[in-house]
């Protein structure tokens, strides 16, 4: 019942933001996540969920996937304006769900910051994860690249969905070894 009222409050707040001609970015998600850090469990998803992650190129790739699916006639919910941490993704979901948490879409396509893969998808369905690259970036938040890769590797140990990895980046390609029982691992390369 608590989550119902959180979603209701965020719907009202979103309406106020629209009236004021404001997007709100990750504001709705920040409030909802503060009120209940396990709110991702509340949402009901009956469509494929695709996540794109990388240090560089995730926004363009995410938006290309979403645009391609929309052009094919699908209803796509996506965080096309960025907001790729847990609160931004949660804001996108809150704007597109019913009060009971049902998300009406043919596809959910999310750009997700590399360090937030384990946070968002611990309690939220994920069917396909695309990882493009890792570079030394935002050391204050992510730490060294190796520690980031190890956190994602730990998440992937129990992940059995589609995993699409850039074989040209050795740090990305090695994530395919995280869960030997996952038969849904695919690699791409420029060659």
Which residues are covered by each model-predicted region?
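Phosphate-binding loop of NTP-binding sites
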Residues: 2-189
């Amino acid at each position: 019942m608590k989550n119902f009222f959180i979603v209701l409050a965020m719907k009202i707040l979103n309406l106020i933001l629209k009236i004021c001609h404001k997007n709100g970015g990750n504001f709705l998600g920040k409030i909802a996540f503060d009120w209940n850090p396990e709110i991702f469990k509340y949402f009901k998803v009956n469509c494929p969920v695709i996540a794109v992650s990388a240090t560089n190129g995730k926004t363009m790739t995410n938006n290309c996937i979403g645009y391609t699916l929309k052009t094919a006639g699908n209803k796509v919910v996506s965080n096309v304006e960025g907001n790729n941490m847990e609160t931004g993704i949660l804001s996108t979901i809150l704007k597109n769900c019913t009060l009971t948490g049902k998300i009406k879409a043919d596809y959910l396509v999310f750009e997700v910051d590399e360090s937030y893969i384990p946070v968002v998808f611990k309690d939220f369905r994920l069917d396909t994860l695309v990882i493009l690259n890792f570079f030394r970036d935002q050391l204050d938040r992510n730490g060294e690249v190796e520690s980031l890769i190890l956190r994602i590797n730990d998440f992937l140990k129990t992940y059995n969905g589609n995993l699409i990895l850039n074989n040209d980046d050795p740090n990305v390609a090695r994530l395919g070894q995280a869960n030997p029982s996952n038969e849904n691992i695919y690699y791409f390369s420029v060659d």
